Design a protein with these regions (language model features):
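Terminal, low-structured helical/coil segments at or just beyond the last alpha-helical repeat
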Residues: 32-53, 228-281
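Canonical tetratricopeptide repeat
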Residues: 67, 101-104, 135, 169-171, ...
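Residue-level recognition of tetratricopeptide repeat
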Residues: 61, 95, 129, 163-165, ...
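Register position in tetratricopeptide repeats
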Residues: 74, 108-109, 142-143, 178, ...
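TPR alpha-solenoid repeat register
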Residues: 98, 132, 166-168, 202, ...
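Structural marker of alpha-solenoid helical repeat scaffolds
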Residues: 57, 91, 125-126, 159-161, ...
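N-terminal leader/linker segments that initiate helical-solenoid repeat arrays
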Residues: 27-86, 90-92, 275-281
Length: 281
């Protein structure tokens, strides 16, 4: 497995995503975060975050449909989710979050044309919506449209009051890895780490980049942050630590990580590679 595939797998597993896109298991981000910012809110000053108490009855009914759609989406009941989206938009056509979720559903169904159209529609309705920018960028990245994805992540991370900045920087770094842009990936991941040093996906991917660059001592620092918690450690993170110690000619520590890998993730690809001594894969 190449580092590009391994880092993508790790980032999908580790990024906590809430709200609309929880079912994506990782890199997607909710544009709502409880923030219903479309027309229909009352009593809100410019620049305020709109909360549910600001909703009028029309928006509230649409939101209920949207929440149902999100639930069906997480259960992979995509046709039913789309039907709820249609009803939400029939109630309130200005609900950007519903259009965004429609894009995510079409993407999950493998309908790229409709997914992209929905993302474009959502951005035309709200060009600076950080969640939409992030999710559209990740969609493009997964389809190897790296040049188109990158500015969307930058724009998402730069939005004022954005709750997605660290995720957008992280996923931007992962996309840059997949594009072979290692120096740029290090910068994006380092910035994400500065903002959220507790995120294990950021630490793992940054360590992976540094390993690729041959900076093994620095790589060791970040991967230790991940493996220090048994709840965060994965077969991938323990294998990376094992490989780092092998490169540093530290067989005792290498074998300690290998033992953890064998005991906790027996039968995994990484455990098998350790048993075979294939540290360059």
């Amino acid at each position: 497995m190449t580092w590009r595939k391994a880092t993508a797998r790790m980032v999908w597993a580790c990024i906590a995503a809430g709200g609309l896109a929880a079912a994506l298991g990782g890199c997607a981000s909710s544009s709502s975060n409880g923030n219903w910012r479309q027309s229909g809110a009352q009593g809100v000053g410019k620049g305020d975050i709109v909360t549910q108490s600001d909703e009028n009855e029309v928006r509230k009914r649409a939101r209920i449909r949207l929440e149902l759609a999100s639930t069906y989406f997480t259960q992979a009941q995509y046709t039913t989710a789309l039907d709820e989206i249609k009803q939400a938009l029939a109630i309130d056509p200005t609900l950007v979050s519903a259009v965004e979720l429609r894009a995510l559903i079409y993407d999950a169904m493998g309908d790229q044309a409709r997914a992209e159209d929905a993302f474009k529609q959502a951005l035309s309705m709200e060009p600076n919506n950080a969640g939409v920018l992030h999710n559209y960028g990740w969609y493009l990245c997964r389809h190897k449209e790296f040049a188109r994805a990158d500015p969307l992540f930058v724009q998402a991370a730069n939005q004022p009051m954005s709750l997605t900045a660290t995720k957008s920087l992280l996923v931007r770094g992962v996309c840059q890895i997949q594009a072979g842009q290692w120096a740029e990936a290090e910068k994006s991941l380092a910035k994400s780490y500065e903002l959220d040093p507790a995120n294990p996906a950021t630490a793992y991917n940054l360590s992976a980049v540094l390993f690729h660059k041959g900076e093994f001592e620095r790589a060791r620092f970040y991967i230790r942050r991940v493996n220090a918690s048994s709840q965060q450690a994965t077969a991938e993170s323990l294998w990376l630590a094992t490989r780092i110690e092998h490169k540093l000619d530290n067989p005792t520590v290498r074998d300690e990580f290998g033992a953890q890998l064998r005991n906790r993730f027996a039968g995994s690809r990484e455990a098998n590679l350790f048993e075979l001594g294939r540290f360059d894969e």
